[in-house]
């Protein structure tokens, strides 16, 4: 594991973190810029592992360093300095961007799901930004601290798709990769799922469409609300940051992100069958609408259900935690969790 303390003050962007240190080396959550935060509780050590990525502005000699990193914390507010759990090799297929890491414990090992982007381009539909090779790759380690190693030789999402934000779900003993198909390729971004081999090394079937972003009444076209991409306005509906959750009454929910009437938001979909295949129906209003997103849920060591998001959605992102109540098949935000409140 390699300390990345020397990134203090660097300029970073989507899918990344930055920090300002203290003399003791301890970090207050409010100091750490992090996008797409992922929390893995470890009951054995009463430690929370919080994963992020660094993408720009860090060099080892002439080689720009890109890595997945982890912070350790006992209380979710005071974080230890980050260490690298996977440095993306210089010759790796996906070194352009490193986004949205998730780490899942499964059958005695730890699996890292991370979204990577290549320089390689894909055929681009009319009136779309240049399409590039992007997908979620799965890596494995014996410890939540890594080091992680790739399971295969590329992404487990379809090779010709712009896919991102891969997450993990197991249904009837079958592991699934659940991910987003990006608006830049298909206009109306979608959520899809593909079954994985027992060792998670490769897909064993064709991807299955779950739903499109535009199906939610609260979602707005990014172009209509003035949300530009690379300086241009596109007619498109964004699908981001999916997370599956089974409520105590057995309802299967998906939390996910897109743009609402004016800001980035978190919505909730529910499976009418209680299974991954759906059909899925959308809550009419978002769960969270104040310019934050990419949700994931975890339970604290005293069994409180907490949602992690980044907020705001650009440039000064911070991890925010909200305690949730399950009310039948519905989630409600009780209030912000922890001391590092906005």
Residue map of PLM features:
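Bacterial N-terminal signal peptides that target proteins for export
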Residues: 1-11
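Intrinsic low-complexity, intrinsically disordered segments enriched in polar/basic residues
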Residues: 4, 18-23
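Bacterial N-terminal signal peptides
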Residues: 9-20
């Amino acid at each position: 594991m390699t300390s990345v303390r020397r990134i203090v003050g660097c300029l970073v962007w989507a899918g990344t973190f930055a920090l300002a240190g203290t003399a003791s080396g301890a970090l207050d959550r409010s100091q750490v810029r992090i996008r797409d935060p992922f929390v893995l509780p470890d009951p054995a050590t009463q430690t929370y592992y919080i994963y992020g990525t660094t993408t720009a502005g860090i060099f080892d000699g002439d080689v720009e360093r890109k890595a997945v990193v982890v912070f350790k914390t006992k209380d979710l507010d005071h974080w230890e300095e980050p260490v690298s759990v996977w440095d993306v090799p210089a010759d790796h297929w996906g070194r352009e961007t490193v986004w949205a890491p998730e780490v899942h414990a499964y059958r005695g090992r730890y699996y890292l799901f991370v979204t990577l982007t290549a320089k390689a381009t894909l055929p681009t539909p009319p009136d779309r930004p240049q399409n590039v090779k992007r997908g979620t790759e799965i890596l494995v380690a014996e410890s939540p601290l890594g080091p992680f190693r790739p399971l295969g030789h590329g992404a487990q999402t379809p090779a010709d798709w712009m896919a991102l934000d891969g997450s993990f779900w197991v249904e009837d003993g079958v592991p699934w990769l659940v991910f987003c198909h990006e608006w830049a390729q298909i206009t109306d971004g979608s959520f899809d799922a593909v079954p994985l081999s027992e060792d998670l090394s490769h897909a064993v079937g064709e991807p299955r469409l779950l739903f499109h972003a535009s199906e939610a009444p609260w979602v707005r076209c990014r172009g209509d609300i003035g949300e530009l991409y690379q300086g241009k306005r596109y007619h498109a509906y964004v699908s981001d940051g999916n997370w599956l959750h089974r409520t105590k009454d057995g309802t299967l929910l998906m939390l996910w992100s897109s743009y609402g009437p004016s800001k980035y938001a978190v919505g909730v979909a529910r499976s009418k069958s209680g299974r991954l295949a759906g059909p899925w129906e959308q809550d009419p209003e978002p769960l969270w609408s104040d310019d934050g997103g990419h949700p994931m849920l975890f339970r604290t060591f005293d069994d409180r259900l907490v949602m992690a998001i980044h907020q705001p959605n650009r440039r000064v992102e911070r991890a925010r935690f909200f305690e949730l109540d399950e009310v039948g098949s519905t989630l409600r935000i009780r209030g912000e969790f922890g001391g590092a409140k906005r």
